[in-house]
Amino acid sequence: MSDTLLIRNVRPAGGTATDVLIRDGRIAAIGAGATGGDASFDAGGRLMIPGLVEAHTHLDKSFWGMGWHKHTAGPALIDKIETERRNRREFGIDANRQSGRLVAQMVKLGTTHIRSHVDVDTDLG
């Protein structure tokens, strides 16, 4: 993997097209004078935005990649907990598999940081 990447003809935050040099995963220079790069490519005037952040998710409860299931939990917190436990058993939800599926999709769509909550309970062992 290259330590530096020169992205030519890109529009940071929708502004005027320019060049951006990335070094060690961070922006090192912006402007037509940005040079160098172990690798480079022309972005064709595309938009450059910061990576997306998912600040609150429950990766272990994802149905991503599975069929559609109606949400049947009641309004109380205990209703939601019991429904989630029942769904886990009934639909054979594997937290590792489902978490991986959802993370892969998030990264594909531009997410660079994820903060997740997970269950630790007697049903999981």
Region spans (language model):
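Active-site gating loops and adjacent loop-to-helix segments of metal-dependent hydrolytic enzymes
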Residues: 62-95
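Single, functionally critical "micro-switch" positions that shape active/binding sites
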Residues: 53-57, 84, 109
